[in-house]
């Protein structure tokens, strides 16, 4: 591909969604930025159903050309976002190392240079706290383009180079895949052995600090910990957090991305209220669980943790780094039972729960499909989840939307309240294949291909138009293309 990778800002505002599959108009197609310099075919003006079920997916010259150009673009994006040992999600908007971003980015880096992929994970785990927690952001270098930075998070007795909360623990999943697919087996085995004790300590921290009552499912105490920051799943629980008299602040994200695509002020006020309260407690794990006014059972965190425990168990055997696997097996056994309490029979979907009320949180989100990725659903429940997913896909042009498109809080362009995220599509696709729903997995994969082809490499995508939105030249989207969508 000639010239630099282009990441032009989106220019279309999506409105509410109808209940029938929409048609992508020719006018919309013409103004969508095609970052990969591939002409949008005439079929882009046809119905989403026609595109979705194209029989020649992954066949023929168009896909071959698209693949070559996409791979080159994605390699350039990861190279440009490389800060020397760690990768930022996107320039300006996210200038630091994010936890689950880096773990997922390592999968893409492994398709380019294995040693660099291991360095990404090693750099992330080097920020681990003494208690085992791995923070959700590591502040390697100063930056004026992001708020809240280290000056807000720092406390007298805790590190000032990171945040005081965590994120979904993807790292063990990545370590296993890198080891399994390694060409340099000696390097991979050495790095897996080096990282295993840190991974085990992190998982132990989750159960000690976030499940002290031994339920089998861990708590999340801040929306930022979920990775799905402004998901409508948190609306009810977050609304009960009283807004404290917090210092005045200026959001930096709105200087990079349209406010219509970002969390709103009332949410940010509560995010910061929680932050300042946690800092006042010096991030003491013994106090946070009991004193936080926001405590939920997040499906994304728990599903990823369960899958990561499976992979940690595999790593224990593959590396010989752990002689007693009973602790890990205990975690998975308790979780297998506990996940049943999160299944909503009427909705045909798993739901998050408010731990302070014991009630389901009302919004249906894409996290409800992740128990397939974790492998915790029975055959009957998996069938119900697959049917629900099929209905969601029928309701939009491109899946998987991050919120049920029929829900009143669905917003097609606002961050985790509607847009499609390729990392979720990858996890759900893996889960569908795990349960034998290969055709549905291909449907998700085809939608993902169309999004990248017509929308570019963005943070997320509008499920109605396919427009790329949020941050441009986005690292984990590029990584998903390299490690999944266009992987040989």
Curated annotation (Swiss-Prot):
One GO BP: protein N-linked glycosylation
Pfam families: MGH1-like_GH (PF22422)
Family recorded in the similarity comment: Belongs to the glycosyl hydrolase 63 family.
Listed name of the protein: Mannosylglycerate hydrolase MGH2
Source species taxonomy: Eukaryota, Viridiplantae, Streptophyta, Embryophyta, Tracheophyta
UniProt cross-references to PANTHER family, sorted A to Z: MANNOSYL-OLIGOSACCHARIDE GLUCOSIDASE (PTHR10412:SF11)
Activity control mechanisms: Activity is not dependent on divalent cations, but it is enhanced by Mn(2+).
EC number: 3.2.1.170
GO CC annotation terms, alphabetical: endoplasmic reticulum membrane
Catalytic residue list: 229, 459
Residues annotated for substrate binding in this entry: 94, 98-101, 146, 167, 227, 262, 415-416
Catalysed reaction equations from the record: (2R)-2-O-(alpha-D-mannosyl)-glycerate + H2O = D-mannose + (R)-glycerate; (2R)-2-O-(alpha-D-glucopyranosyl)-glycerate + H2O = (R)-glycerate + D-glucose
Keywords assigned: Glycosidase, Hydrolase
Top enzyme category: hydrolase
MF GO annotations: Glc3Man9GlcNAc2 oligosaccharide glucosidase activity; mannosylglycerate hydrolase activity
Role according to the record: Catalyzes the hydrolysis of alpha-D-mannosyl-glycerate (MG) to D-glycerate and D-mannose. Can also hydrolyze alpha-D-glucopyranosyl-glycerate (GG)with lower efficiency.
Keyword Lipid biosynthesis in record: no
